[in-house]
Amino acid sequence: MNRVLVIGCGKMARAVIPLLARNPEFFREICVSGRSKEKCDTYKKKYSSDKQKIVTAFVDINNKEKTRLMAKIYNPDLVINLAPSYLNLKVMDLCLEIEANYLDASLYIPKGSTQCDINAEYAYDQKFREKGLTAIIGCGFNPGVMNAFGQYAAGKLLDEISKVDIIDMNAGTNAHPYLMNTPMNTSLRQISSEGRMFTDGKIISVPPLSVQAKYSFPEIGKRNLFMVDHEVIDALSTELPGMPTIRYFSGFKRTFMSMVKVLRDVGMTSTTPVDIDGQQIAPLDFLYEVMPQQDDLAATAKGKTGIGMLVTGAVEGEKKQELIYALVDHQQCYEEFGASATDFMSAAALVSGANMIVTGQWKQDGVHMISEFDPQPFLKELKRQGLDYKVLEEAPDLEVSEHGTEEEAE
């Protein structure tokens, strides 16, 4: 019997738990745990059945002893980590103690940092090997599905690849014209930090928003984009090192950019803690707490968002460019799951990865990313979970220009 422990009952659980509940043949028993047991209990009431038992538990991953006791009592085969990414290492430690396989959606980003530390998770490789356990890291959409897209493109679409551009249209509207549909902390981090790209075997940085581009995305249209930092660059450059150039471009509303410029000018995007009546708090952390949360935005989001991988290379010596992409409707996701389109995309990837682990298709001791496995079974499972993808042959060019400006946002 496959017993799954889900750690974290935040916004992403809104899509993960329903998707797990649709697969009782693979997940016979689920324990939903989080800091709010009341919230966990709502999933038990809604989804527990004769075919699939759901139990709940309170968990504070920072309380090591109580968390370990709870996990040992439940004795899961697999732990799905939905906690904030800065807690990844603590959850990995837990899996080693209770001898359970591990799965997360986001790479480890130390608290207060703007960059992921993929090597910190890979440092656990030998420990998981010694225990005979599998740990799959970065199994969301981005990274995750994007890694599979890269592997698929290299094996099936092109003979050689010279350039990979991740294009996140970040599209759709909501009732807050100055806010994006993606998490506030993610968007703020991306536009406040230096842009990064992988080229000639190393990662280089450029000033924030200094590289602009335009792209015509299927069913969305032509939008302005900026090259930004993203953990998928670390993932792809590590797992697919033969790719000469890897970049990440994302779109932002002009009103959002204007708001962030003002906040940045007055110091509110700083990650350096300041003393307020004896309490140490980073301005960015405070800002994130007082701004509307993604749950509020998802309820009013409309339109579609699209993310794709534009691969440039050659087939039989002739230049070829193709776009592998996914499109998701904001309203449809909220009506079905009460979740954002972004969370659904990551949830579908995560549950597909969980399926790969419990069925033995991803049984490999140590710490791995999904690009180490044949991408086609995973992509097939992704479609079964409701997230389709398409391939656009003869894809349009990405129009890139240096020295972008914030005024060039949508």
Locations of regions flagged by a protein language model:
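Conserved Rossmann-fold cofactor-binding substructure of NAD(P)-dependent oxidoreductases
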Residues: 61-74, 87
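Rossmann-fold NAD(P)-binding glycine/threonine-rich loop
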Residues: 106-133
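Rossmann-fold cofactor-recognition segment
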Residues: 49-63
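N-terminal Rossmann-like NAD(P) cofactor-binding module of classical short-chain dehydrogenase/reductase
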Residues: 71, 77-81, 102-103
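Hydrophobic/small residue at the entry helix of a nucleotide-binding pocket
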Residues: 12-15
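Helix N-cap at the beta1-alpha1 junction of Rossmann-like dinucleotide-binding domains, i.e.
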Residues: 36-39
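C-terminal catalytic/substrate-binding lobe primarily of soluble NAD(P)-dependent oxidoreductases
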Residues: 155-410
